[in-house]
């Protein structure tokens, strides 16, 4: 079974031990003025608000202009638009300040003052224009007078998609607050501490501990506070020291978040109830607490009650009324912990398993190597799907190899069919045995029924049960021999499946022999070589004839080239006939 992912003592100490800060970090964190830019727009029937950007004034105060940097407006899509902002406070005309302020936000007319987005070609433009853009990804909104008191109460403006639009598409709000700036190191530690605290609160809720219960402390006067993994690991380290384990400087105590933090360990003897113990709250202390089982001891050393005497080595023989557990001890009864045990002899709880236990932190001790293997598991190497191509053999060789592997696949299919037949025989033998047993049970049931009826009617003096009932007599037929035969068949098949296939006697033929796996891959190249040897003489003879013919024609042409044909008498006769025909 795979081990759970551990939460180690080393990691906890690393998270909770802060880095030694410098002198500047030990002083009280400074306070600064911070500007916020919020955008509000309507999305369907829902009103949405988001923080576009924040910017801090200089440490000595807001004595110089500040600029917001943000990527985009939520209500204006980048591209086919030119965002424009209107404020009421910087309007010079009374019509722009007094009319349709809630609707238009200072720009009900075209002559009102509007801050149109300008292309940010130089940094000096920020001193001239309030709203600029680099044309790609960033907008710049400048506050020229951050020292003005209006920003503390907040300034509201309207956002238009185009300067010529009649109505705005969103609302902007800019305000200034005095905040406490936390250094980055302390901020990171604070976030980690908050996360650990949240996890401990969740686990504390799951543990369902009593606020006054002595859960993980050994002093019965101490009150257990909220559950803490640090406290759990500390108690685990204390137990390790008490156990006398040495040379643990390079070991790790680990616990798992997915498992209960405590485990109940059975004690070898009953509690000493003679002394006066501190009063504990009555009732159930905790539920679903797992019990530790020693794999080397099949029995529990001591039990107060048990449903089976074989489970315990020793059972409590005294009275189980009004028993109290001392500090650090509990009664474990069916996954439930309690400090008091009050069981009468006729109570149903007397048939449950109740043990004296002590709660121990559920920790695991790992060495350096074991922890390294858990945190960084070894990488599994992937096997090559087509090894000939991976190791650099040519594609032709790979194709030939894949073709030769067909024989091995055929042999594997034949072996699988043989195995399927044997399994089928085993299933049939098992079914036959079960059917035989069922027939025996049916036969016994019929005989018992007939005997019961015969004995009830006492009809032995009238010819026996069969004659009185007027039906055939049924007797038990011992079919155990058939069962034994079927079992022997199963044993033979089992031995045949486990025995290596080394004998040459196969029911399917010689092609199912293991030797076939080695022979078949060589058949294809042998056949190819034989085919080449068969056609090689014909090919060679054809090539030889062609070469001879070409050589003969070439030699004749070279020898007859200087000679020409001489005229004969037949040639003169042909010329005379030609002239006569032309004269006619």
Curated annotation (Swiss-Prot):
GO terms for cellular component: plasma membrane. Residues 384-404 are annotated as: Fusion peptide. Disulfide bonds join 466-473. Keywords: Cell membrane, Cleavage on pair of basic residues, Disulfide bond, ERV, Glycoprotein, Membrane, Signal, Transmembrane, Transmembrane helix, Transposable element, Viral envelope protein, Virion. Low expression in skin, testis and trachea. Its main location: virion. Specific enzymatic cleavages in vivo yield the mature SU and TM proteins. The CXXC motif is highly conserved across a broad range of retroviral envelope proteins. It is thought to participate in the formation of a labile disulfide bond possibly with the CX6CC motif present in the transmembrane protein. Pfam families: TLV_coat. A motif (CKS-17) lies at residues 449-465. Residues 23-518 are extracellular. Glycans are attached at residues 69, 247, 272, 276, 308, 313, 322, 334, 342, 346, 478. The record marks 383-384 as: Cleavage. Residues 1-22 form the signal peptide. A motif (CX6CC) lies at residues 466-474. Orthologs in P.troglodytes and G.gorilla (truncated). Belongs to the gamma type-C retroviral envelope protein family. HERV class-I F(c)1 env subfamily. This is Endogenous retrovirus group FC1 Env polyprotein. It comes from Homo sapiens (Human). The gene is ERVFC1.
């Amino acid at each position: 079974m795979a081990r759970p992912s551990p939460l180690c003592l080393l990691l906890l100490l690393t998270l909770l031990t802060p880095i030694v800060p410098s002198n500047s970090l030990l002083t009280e964190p400074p306070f600064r003025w911070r500007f916020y830019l919020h955008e509000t727009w309507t999305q369907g029937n829902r009103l949405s608000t988001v923080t576009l950007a924040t910017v801090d004034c200089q440490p000595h105060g807001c004595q110089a202009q500040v600029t917001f940097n943000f990527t985009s407006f939520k209500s204006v899509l980048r591209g086919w638009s030119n965002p424009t902002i209107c404020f009421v406070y910087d309007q010079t005309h009374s019509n722009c300040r007094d009319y349709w302020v809630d609707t238009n936000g200072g720009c009900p007319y075209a002559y009102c003052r509007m801050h149109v987005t300008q292309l940010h070609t130089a940094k000096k433009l920020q001193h001239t224009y309030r709203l600029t853009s680099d044309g790609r990804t960033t907008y710049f909104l400048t506050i020229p007078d951050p020292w003005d008191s209006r920003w503390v109460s907040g300034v509201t403006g309207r956002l238009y998609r185009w300067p010529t639009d009649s109505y705005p598409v969103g609302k902007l709000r800019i305000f200034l607050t005095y905040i406490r700036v936390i250094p980055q190191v302390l901020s990171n530690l604070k976030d980690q501490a908050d996360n650990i605290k949240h996890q401990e609160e969740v686990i504390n809720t799951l543990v369902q501990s009593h606020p006054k219960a002595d859960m993980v402390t050994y002093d019965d006067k101490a009150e257990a506070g909220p559950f803490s993994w640090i406290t759990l690991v500390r108690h685990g380290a204390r137990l390790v020291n008490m156990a006398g384990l040495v040379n643990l400087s390079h070991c790790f105590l680990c616990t798992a978040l997915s498992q209960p933090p405590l485990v109940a360990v059975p004690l070898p003897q009953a509690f000493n109830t003679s002394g006066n113990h501190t009063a504990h709250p009555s009732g159930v202390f905790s539920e679903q607490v797992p019990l530790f089982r020693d794999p080397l001891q099949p029995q529990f050393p001591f039990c107060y009650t048990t449903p089976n005497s074989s489970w315990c080595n020793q059972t409590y023989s005294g009275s189980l009324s009004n028993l109290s557990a001392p500090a650090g001890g509990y009664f474990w009864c069916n996954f439930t912990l309690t400090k008091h045990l009050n069981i009468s002899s006729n109570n149903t709880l007397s048939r449950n398993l109740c043990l004296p236990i002590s709660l121990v932190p559920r920790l695991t001790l790992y060495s350096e190597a074991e922890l390294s293997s858990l945190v960084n598991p070894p990488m599994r190497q992937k096997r090559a799907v087509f090894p000939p191509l991976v190791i650099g053999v040519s594609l032709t060789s790979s194709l030939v190899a894949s073709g030769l592997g067909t024989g091995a696949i055929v042999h594997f299919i034949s072996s699988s069919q043989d195995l399927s037949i044997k399994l089928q025989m085993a299933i049939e033998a098992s079914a036959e045995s079960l059917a035989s047993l069922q027939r025996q049970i049916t036969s016994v049931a019929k005989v018992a029924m007939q005997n019961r009826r015969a004995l009830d009617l006492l009809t032995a003096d009238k010819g026996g049960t069969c004659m009185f009932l007027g039906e055939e007599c049924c007797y038990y037929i011992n079919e155990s021999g058939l069962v034994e035969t079927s079992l022997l068949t199963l044993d033979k098949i089992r031995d045949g499946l486990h025995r290596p296939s080394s004998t040459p006697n196969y029911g399917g033929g010689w092609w199912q022999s293991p030797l076939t796996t080695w022979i078949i891959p060589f058949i294809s190249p042998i056949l190819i070589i034989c085919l080449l040897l068969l056609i090689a003489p014909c090919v060679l003879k054809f090539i030889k004839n062609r070469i001879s013919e070409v050589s003969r024609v070439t030699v004749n042409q070279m020898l007859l080239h200087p000679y020409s044909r001489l005229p004969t008498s037949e040639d003169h006769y042909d010329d005379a006939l030609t002239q006569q025909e032309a004269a006619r």
